[in-house]
Amino acid sequence: MVSSTPEMLQGGLTREQIVPSRKRIKLPAWLEIAKPRLIPLLLATTLGGMALSEGWPLPSLRLACTLGGGALAAAAAGVLNCIWEQDLDGRMQRTSGRALPSGRLSPTAAFIGAISCTLAAAALLVSGVNCLAAGLSLLGLCSYVLLYTAILKPRTPQNIVIGGVAGAIPPLVGAAAASGHVGLSGWWLFALVMLWTPAHFWALALLLRDDYRAVGIPMLPVVKGPVVTVRAISRYGWATVLLSGFGVWALPEGGLLYGLLLIPFNARLLQMVHQLGAAPENVDRAKGLFRWSIFYMFGICLLLVVSRLPMAANFDLQAWSLLQQMASSGQFI
């Protein structure tokens, strides 16, 4: 018999306080399995990839097709993930109420929905964008379902390090949509998302390690414990901050404004990483870092878009001109 009393986790918080409750956020079964909460950030990094390209801004129709196709591909990946993990979800208290393990939706209906979304995404991207963007979107879908979900997640604590490639593909899609190819700037944002992902996900895994342990999923906090996990979070957090600075050169214009606006984002990220390092078992700090890491990546993508505005280019020209005047007059000496 399952107790109706909320389970208490580390720090005296209930699971419902750590992870949003499905009872509070009611979604239709067909929408729930598409994991809509994950899609906005994927689309934001797609926009970031576009903003890094010479083809920015995109025509309205191509922009809409790129984002629509990306959302459909992400939804299909989410559904296929739920189908693959329905037995696992049924054994975890946090996920047992999801549409498939609870019986609110049949696997057949879910699979039909996933295939429909995949075909619609491919059609929209091929017809409204280009074949490269379509191919990269499908590669991201397959990477998430096959590489991460089926192969890496149940086998290695480094699953999210390697499997993070799936979440890092949207910037490549954006770059391909904007210019028809993926340049070095697109690969820079791909690498940044790859480095950001482990720290982001391990902060959440610290909160849910009891669930993962119960079903035998070898997440890093389960295998190595919170202290080692927090050290790894610190390494990836610092790597993310260092690589993020290269956006100054990755942007075709507006890089100086990006660099200045980036400083508070990186300072806050490092502060939260340091705070968690001082108390690896602290639930509030892990939860705070997880939430901030989401805001951080949204912020990076917003900065990339803002830095492509005409006023950002003007700011760069005036700033560099001022710096050159100061250098020539010896004011730096």
From Swiss-Prot:
It catalyses: heme b + (2E,6E)-farnesyl diphosphate + H2O = Fe(II)-heme o + diphosphate. Coiled coil: none annotated. Keywords: Cell inner membrane, Cell membrane, Heme biosynthesis, Membrane, Transferase, Transmembrane, Transmembrane helix. The chain crosses the membrane at residues 63-83, 109-129, 132-152, 160-180, 188-208, 245-265, 292-312. Pathway: Porphyrin-containing compound metabolism; heme O biosynthesis; heme O from protoheme: step 1/1. One of its GO terms (biological process) is heme O biosynthetic process. Converts heme B (protoheme IX) to heme O by substitution of the vinyl group on carbon 2 of heme B porphyrin ring with a hydroxyethyl farnesyl side group. Belongs to the UbiA prenyltransferase family. Protoheme IX farnesyltransferase subfamily. HAMAP family: CyoE_CtaB. Carbon 2 of the heme B porphyrin ring is defined according to the Fischer nomenclature. This is Protoheme IX farnesyltransferase. The lineage of its organism: Bacteria, Bacillati, Cyanobacteriota, Cyanophyceae, Synechococcales.
